[in-house]
Swiss-Prot record:
InterPro entries: Ribosome_maturation_RimP, RimP_C, RimP_C_sf, RimP_N, RimP_N_sf
UniProt entry tagged with the keyword Cytoplasm: yes
Protein name, per record: Ribosome maturation factor RimP
Organism whose genome encodes this protein: Rhodopseudomonas palustris (strain BisA53)
Tagged with keyword Secreted: no
Subcellular location, principal: cytoplasm
Lineage: Bacteria, Pseudomonadati, Pseudomonadota, Alphaproteobacteria, Hyphomicrobiales
Amino acid sequence: MKPMPDQTDILPATADPIPAELLELLSEPRLVVEPGVAARVAAVAGPVLHGMGYRLVRIKVSGELGCTVQIMAERPDGTMLIEDCEAISKALSPVLDVADPIDKAYRLEVSSPGIDRPLVRRSDFERYAGYLVKIDMAVPHQGRKRFRGILGGIEGDAVHLQREGVRGDDDPAVLLTIEDISDARLVLTDELIAESMRRGKIAEREMKQNLGILPPPPPHAKKSDPTKSNAPKPKAAKAKSKVAKTPPKNTKEHRLAAERLRRGDIDPPEGD
């Protein structure tokens, strides 16, 4: 493997400066990271993505059918389009060739994190609070290494989780220390798919507006916040009305009675 060059010498030049409001999100460190060869790739890819306005999510090096390096990336708001993946691949390929973090031939794949994405930053655990997740621990918590349940956000340096399928007297609520987590990811649900589609449409619309393909929205239009979580909320119980409902007056029974009354068969019922 070649010596790692200075990152400042191999970063691609960006066309536009990164807006100040995005710098904080771009600079947020990952709390769940990969070891070994993937860590060497991350040391090269991370600064490149940051300079382009993207965040590194996860790197996976697979040896099946040859060596494949998969790089997951995203915009600061969590969205990712095909055009973003193409731009990253084009900029990152020559940088990896120079840095050479892998000592054999490999195939580079750049992708979005996916709908059932890994959670690697503090903001990820906060953004997807209310959704179903599964978490694997590097260090067991109360004798367990695998957990599944509804994410409750961050409490200090730990993740709050409301576990599913708890039996007996076990407390469903647990706090899992973030630095002890080896893998955390969302579980595919209908609510998660709907939320992902919403964010994707917003990102695509903004890209078309920036390219001049789509006219800008009117000044009075309400702007959606793609960083806001739209997790499903508990349904409130409907209060029962105490007002007595008026019984119907035009049922089949009433019509038959009216016909018999017209023929003089019976007297009209009281109140009709």
